[in-house]
Every structure is written in structure tokens, then in C-alpha cells.
Amino acid sequence: MTSDGATSTSAAAAAAAMATRRKPSWRERENNRRRERRRRAVAAKIYTGLRAQGNYNLPKHCDNNEVLKALCSEAGWVVEEDGTTYRKGHKPLPGDMAGSSSRATPYSSHNQSPLSSTFDSPILSYQVSPSSSSFPSPSRVGDPHNISTIFPFLRNGGIPSSLPPLRISNSAPVTPPVSSPTSRNPKPLPTWESFTKQSMSMAAKQSMTSLNYPFYAVSAPASPTHHRQFHAPATIPECDESDSSTVDSGHWISFQKFAQQQPFSASMVPTSPTFNLVKPAPQQLSPNTAAIQEIGQSSEFKFENSQVKPWEGERIHDVAMEDLELTLGNGKAHS
């Protein structure tokens, strides 16, 4: 009863599967028939040729497996009843054949070579044998009259004897052995955070090196008393330097620490038009300017460890905070 019930159940399942499966159209069925007829015609011609010209014991109605067995037997292979195929004298172990779809042979890539990269090689990877490279190396050309040399001009003293021997290898890089220090302590792979930190540190270094040049305020005017100095005043056409309030507005901005440590060079001189205001170029003194400088020494005074000279007609230390008045939109100062 159980077997009958199981049979009926399986038949019902098969019928349900056939009912739900899509039925092929008449064109698809015709194509399948034509394809099958062509395959059988080709197989029949193959069998006829093998029977006529080959010493094959093929049955009258045989399939492709029989033909494959006959061909393997002629080529020196052994085909067992279960389909195990191997060369004569190289029968594989039962463990090697179980669970593998491809038959392993001594010439198969599944067998690891003793010279594989997983083993410690006594020969360095860049030292190749003469037969391993498809291109001859100029340092190991045995025959000077070898016509296969790609660069014939390198044979007759083309390479200096002082250079080390050239090693050429076309093989892929091998895995370093376990005894290698790079294998024990591999370099960490770069991450986005490390790359960002490195780029930020490089940008900071570049910005600090750019601060080595002295900076000066562009708004610093050229005082008329600079005519008494060693150079002619530098003028800025875009600015009106007649206003005396720009002199008393604030100190000049200068970072002269780096400039004091080492002398100026042609590459360090900034292109600002007011650079000559602070670092004048040396010029020869004329007798007139020397006399004027001696006259004006009495009106100098110390300001931040430097000599400051007033303009002609200018009063220093006479302007107090009480004399200044803040006007909002009047445009008129307190007289």
C-alpha cells in the first residue's frame, strides 16, 4: 500500500509539473527536431569514418561515450567502467579522485610544484635562468654572434663595465617567504584617514615655509622724510599717500625674524611695491642728502627700537586723545 501511495503521489506531482510548465510552440518543437537530426547525422558520419579507417571495436548502435573510450584507448589512456580516465602508469589515488569534477593528472595545475611561491626558493626572484625569459638579457648573452639579440649595438662595449649586471624577469612577483622581514611585519595598507592626515601635514609644512618671507603692510605710505634716506621713495599709484592719518593709524606689519637670520636674495624679495619702504636698496649718498640728514637728526626719536623721523611740518606727541572727536555723519570736525 505504501509503495502504491508513493507511486501515485509522484505521478500526481509529475502531472502537476507538466500542467504548470509552459508548452513549447510548434516552431520551437520543429527547431528542436531539426537540431537533433543534424547532431545524429554528424555522429553517424563520425562512426562510419572510425569503423572504416580505424581499428575501433564500436557496436552498431553506440553513443558518444563509446567513441570517447575508443579514442582514449588509442591515445594511451585508460578508461575504467565508472568513467575514470588516466594515463597508463599514472593511476591517481582514490582520495584525489573523490569529489572532483576534473581528473587530476601529474600535468594538472592542481598539483603544486616544488618551485611554487609558497616555498622558500634558494634563488632570488629577479635572478632568472637563461631559458625562463623570452627576451635575452644583454648581461648574459653567451654567444656574441647570436642573431636573436634584440639590441645588437649593446654587444660590443655598449654597456659600461662599471654598471651592475642587468637582471630581467618576465615572471610575476612572488610571495615573500615566511623568514622575510616584510612578511612578518607587513606594511599597513593606506586608508582614507592616513591619506588625509598626510595631505594636511604637507599643506601645513608648505604654509609654514611660505611664512619665511617677510610680510609688510601694503597700506604703509612712503614718508617724505625717506628722501633723506639712502633710497628714493616707492610710490603706489593706486593709493593717495597725502593723508597723514595713515601714518598714525597703526604699526607697520613686518615679520623680520627670518630676514635677520639670513640675508636677502633675489628669489626671496617679494614683488610688493612697498618692499623698499622697509628694506631699502643701498645707494650712494650725495653731499646734499648727507647735509640734510645731519640737519634732521635732531628731530628723531626712538620708537620700538628704530629711528622714526617726522615729516616736514609734522608735530609728534602733540596730538592727545582729548583733541580727537568722533563725528557721526556730520563730515565736520570740531574746530
Swiss-Prot record:
Gene Ontology biological process terms in this record: brassinosteroid mediated signaling pathway; cellular response to brassinosteroid stimulus; DNA-templated transcription; quiescent center organization
Residue positions where Phosphothreonine is found in the record: 175
Localization (cell): Nucleus; Cytoplasm
Tissue: Ubiquitously expressed in cotyledons, leaves, hypocotyls and roots.
Disulfide bond sites: none
Compositionally biased tracts (Low complexity): 1-19
Domain of life: Eukaryota
Assembly notes: Interacts with ASK7/BIN2 through its C-terminal domain and with the bHLH transcription factors BIM1, BIM2 and BIM3 through its C- and N-terminal domains. Interacts (via N-terminus) with REF6 and ELF6. Interacts with MYB30. Interacts with IWS1. Interacts with ASHH2/SDG8. Binds to MYB56 when dephosphorylated in the nucleus of quiescent center (QC) cells. Binds to WRKY46, WRKY54 and WRKY70 to cooperatively regulate the expression of target genes.
Entry comment, domain topic: The central part (140-272) is important for interaction with MYB30.
UniProt name for this protein: Protein BRASSINAZOLE-RESISTANT 2
Gene: BZR2
